[in-house]
Amino acid sequence: MKNSIIRTKKVLIFFLFLFQYLFICAQELPEQYREKFSESFPIRKEQHLEVKAYIDQLTREKIDESMSSFNPDFISIADYENSLYPYRQKLGSFFGYPPPKAIKGKVSRFEKAGEDKYCTIYRVWIEVIEGVHAYGIYMVPKNIEGKAPLIIAMHGGGGNPEAICDLDTRVNYHSFGHEAVKKGYLVWAPGLTMLSGYAKDSIISGLDRDLFDKQLKLLGSSIIGLEIHKIIESTRVLISEHPEIDIKNIGMTGLSWGGFFTMYTTALCPFIKAAAPSAYFRDSEADLIKTTNVTEGTQSIYQFKGFGHFQAIGMICPRPCMVQIGENDGLFDMNGARIEAKRASLFYEKLGIKDRFEFNTHTLGHEFEIESIFRFFDQHLR
């Protein structure tokens, strides 16, 4: 009985304290809980940091994936060449090559522009899509007997075929076309869809290269894909119709944007035997990082689905390739170019043909150093 009374007292005391606690809490609760916005700022900051870390991780993974996406077969040179097909398909698809409605090319106009003591010069229009023509200059040396090697010579940004052929003076080409025919090379210089500021071309309202590129990308191609088609198809037509061209010895070179087109056209076009891109070469990894830096306002054209410069060289391999850049080129960083050249050289080294790749530097700026280019072509196209 005594123990029961004690237990009852304890229960009563417990409920008394509980009632007092709840009463006090009820008295102290505000009508509405409030706090300053600044008190929750650490949470918002943490949310942003989490998203940034997530994006950084995905970016690094995408960069690594892109840098390692080209894996040809190194068992033998033949196996290597055979393994390039799917990569060329992917590269062509990235640029939208061939473009919609591409056709087998045909010459529309072939006109003599002039001649001098070394060559005869022709202007050529070749229809490559109905209503769309590849235009270029074809230079035929007068001292050839039988067949001669052909050099596809690509002008740079804001340029024209007349400049690289030296019909008028543009010093950074160093009279390339004229010097080539003096050495017995045929020259085919296709034109890109560009206006030339130094030629004082008039601006044509509504006709803009960048606008064309945006429109073509919506339609399954790009200005680059269209122009690669122009280069390849027009060269095919010349080869088929001009017996003076040695079809086993076709090379390609270009300056600046012409260097870009030299790399990627040769990567896609197996009949080009040797390539010498000049004044357009940079670190692909740095380019991919730039792609993710949307605050710059401009992004790399390569993106994660494309192929960097060293990978384009990998698709040129096992054919000979010389990449040229000037130590005083203000547009392309020499340190980045050296990094990229090392990556490119590994394709040749793994196949035991490292002598077929050359990273050629000179003391000039954003321009051709033609002696080295002719030395390279003399070695591989003769």
Model regions: which residues?
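Short beta-strand/loop motif that positions the catalytic acidic residue
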Residues: V323-I325
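Mobile cap/lid helix-loop segments that gate and shape the active-site cleft of serine hydrolases
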Residues: K214-L218, E233, I272-I313, P318, ...
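C-terminal catalytic histidine-bearing segment of alpha/beta-hydrolase fold enzymes
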Residues: K342-R343, Y348-R382
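Bacterial Sec-dependent N-terminal signal peptides
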Residues: M1-Q32, P42
